[in-house]
UniProtKB/Swiss-Prot annotation:
Binding site for 1-deoxy-D-xylulose 5-phosphate: D8, H9, R44, H49, T99
Record note on quaternary structure: Homooctamer; tetramer of dimers.
Keywords tagged on the record: Cytoplasm, Pyridoxine biosynthesis, Transferase
InterPro entries: Aldolase_TIM (IPR013785), PyrdxlP_synth_PdxJ (IPR004569), Pyridoxine-5'_phos_synth (IPR036130)
Pathway involvement of the protein, from the record: Cofactor biosynthesis; pyridoxine 5'-phosphate biosynthesis; pyridoxine 5'-phosphate from D-erythrose 4-phosphate: step 5/5
CDD domains found in the cross-reference section: PNPsynthase
GO molecular function, one term: pyridoxine 5'-phosphate synthase activity
Catalysed reactions, as listed in the record: 3-amino-2-oxopropyl phosphate + 1-deoxy-D-xylulose 5-phosphate = pyridoxine 5'-phosphate + phosphate + 2 H2O + H(+)
Transmembrane segments: none
Site (Transition state stabilizer): E148
GO biological process, one term: pyridoxine biosynthetic process
Organism: Campylobacter fetus subsp. fetus (strain 82-40)
Protein EC: 2.6.99.2
Name of the protein in question: Pyridoxine 5'-phosphate synthase
Length: 257
């Protein structure tokens, strides 16, 4: 199992004061020192954290592959084609969201053209999708070589079942259920991910997973044999506040491997 470390939240901290501290390149090298297999970053249309200079510097200096998350916005795709990361993961994007809220809608008329353009520029293409059979099949038909399964529903259910989240202002209202119901739902979400991963592998797609994964919930996902890579960010950066980024990555690597 490989670990992609998303360092977007280091850039979020930098932008909180609009100064060049902490430096994103320093974060990249700390993640590498901790054993990361890949650096993941998201160049959003609103540039709320990562910007073009960050992307260029990380791609040029990273000793490990760079996975660049992006929307299908034409300006963004042109930047991706120019900078040529190892992989481009196409994600849905809404300006009002705090983070990516769900998998891609695969019925966009422009999506196939974007995938073709990225392939023509020798960039591996992954689609960030919900763990559904039809989405996996469509991803293959559209020309993707990889899918990243959205683990947000699993992660949210796990949190509501196994933490005090329900007693905070961050509780998830639609998951305000009895423990027995949450346990059934958690098993259902895990089964959905396993089945989607298996279908993907059978179709010849590489399978990654991510969103909301942390030190408590990652083991069940990392044990799925059809998944070859996990992309994890916020929980690692949060842990790094107390133990340092290198050590935070090391701890996650121990769980993932």
């Amino acid at each position: 199992m490989k670990l992609g470390v998303n360092i977007d939240h280091v850039a979020v901290l930098r932008e909180a004061r609009a100064v060049n501290d902490p430096q994103i390149i320093h974060a990249m090298f700390e993640a590498v020192s901790g054993g990361a297999d890949q650096i993941t970053i998201h160049l959003r249309e609103d540039r709320r954290h990562i910007n073009e200079d960050d992307v260029k510097n990380i791609i040029n200096l990273s000793p490990i592959p760079v996975n660049l998350e992006c929307s299908i916005n034409s300006e963004i795709i042109d930047i991706v084609c120019e900078l040529k990361p190892h992989r481009a993961t196409i994600v849905p994007e809404k300006r009002e969201e705090l983070t990516t809220e769900g998998g891609l809608s695969l019925d966009s008329l422009n999506l196939k053209n974007v995938i073709s353009k990225l392939n023509d520029n020798d960039i591996k293409v992954s689609l960030f999708i919900n763990p559904k059979k039809n989405d996996v099949i469509m991803s293959k038909e559209l020309g993707a070589t990889c899918v990243e399964l959205h683990t947000g529903a699993y992660a949210n259910t796990f949190l509501m079942l196994n933490s005090n989240l329900n007693h905070t202002k961050y509780k998830i209202d639609n998951l305000n259920l009895k423990r027995g119901e949450l346990e059934i739902l958690l098993n259902s979400e895990l089964t959905r991910i396993k089945e989607a991963a298996n279908i993907s592998t059978n179709l010849g797609l590489e399978v990654a997973a991510g969103h909301g994964l942390n030190y408590q919930n990652v083991t069940a996902i990392s044990s799925i044999k059809d998944i070859f890579e996990l992309n994890i960010g916020q929980s690692i950066v949060a842990k790094s506040v107390f133990v340092g980024l290198k050590n935070a990555v090391k701890e996650m690597m121990e769980l993932v491997k």
